[in-house]
Amino acid sequence: MVYGRPEPAEGTITGNIARSRFDRKKMALVENGGKHAVTHYRCLQSANGAVSLVRCNLETGRTHQIRVHMASIGCNLVGDRLYEKSGKTKIVGLSPETKAFVNSFPRQALHAASLGFVHPRSGEFLQFSVDFPADLHLLLDTCLLNLGASPK
């Protein structure tokens, strides 16, 4: 889940990612150097444009790739303290109680539903899937379902 609503609602973010020159804990998009990274995203639901559920499919697997790419289009991950610009991200369009709940979410609202790769020895493609965690269900219920979610 991200703050805001991606515009356009579906797209591809491409850019090289490298360690930030300003904060060694962060990664950043860079023009020169870094590693090529591609993220395809699609907004699945939005709560008044304040927070949105976004599906990301990665062509590459760079450190902090989703965090960096979503931040680059102004849609930081809910609960991502490292990539927030200044303290709590401003949320417009939600009740004060819901804003407080979102801003106190204790972790990044990020979940890998499926992960696949080619095994280095056998050459076999392996894929693993896992259910959506309960805390993210609660976040979704609070932000999307109870507030009249809108598709895209």
Regions found by a protein language model. Name each.
Residues M1-K152:
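RNA pseudouridine synthases
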